[in-house]
């Protein structure tokens, strides 16, 4: 199996990102291990219709820091969210949206990039990931 090329985290959000997120959040295989609010797709649809693109980044970062996980070519393939739980402690939430890309190391690269941001740039003391034990790909991604 072909291994993933390295990825980068992009903070700037676009209308295309909103459409991709909608597609991913409507896929039960993608969301089965996420603890997202049941109204997330409704909220994304409202944003798609009513929020101008220059304001999307602001809206996605109101309660947490939100990034699109992108290939080196710039293709968005997933997302990472870092939500501050208390001063210096963040919760990480991540997903690779395209099932065809699962198991290739993209999730691991996204986690590593997010941890570098949290620990090296923000000087976080701790980052936690709430992972279901049966979510074996995520367990491997964080080295648990």
Model-derived features with residue positions:
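Acyl-donor (CoA/ACP) binding surface of acyl/acetyltransferases
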Residues: 1-27, 66, 70-144
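Helix-loop element at the rim of GNAT/NAT acetyltransferase active sites that forms part
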Residues: 23-45
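Active-site rim helix/loop that mediates acceptor-substrate recognition in acyltransferases
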Residues: 41-64, 71
């Amino acid at each position: 199996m072909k291994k993933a090329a390295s990825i980068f985290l992009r903070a700037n959000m676009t209308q295309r990102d909103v459409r991709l997120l909608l597609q991913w959040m409507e896929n039960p295989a993608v969301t089965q291990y996420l603890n997202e609010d049941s109204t997330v797709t409704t909220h994304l649809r409202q944003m798609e219709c009513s929020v101008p693109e220059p304001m999307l980044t602001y809206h996605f970062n109101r309660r947490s820091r939100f990034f699109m996980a992108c290939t080196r070519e710039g293709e968005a393939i997933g997302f990472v969210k870092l939500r501050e739980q208390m001063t210096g402690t963040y919760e990480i939430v991540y997903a690779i949206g395209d099932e065809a890309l699962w198991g290739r190391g993209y999730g691991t690269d996204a986690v590593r990039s997010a941890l570098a941001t949290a620990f090296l740039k923000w000087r976080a003391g701790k980052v936690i990931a709430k992972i279901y034990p049966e979510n074996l790909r995520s367990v491997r991604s964080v080295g648990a």
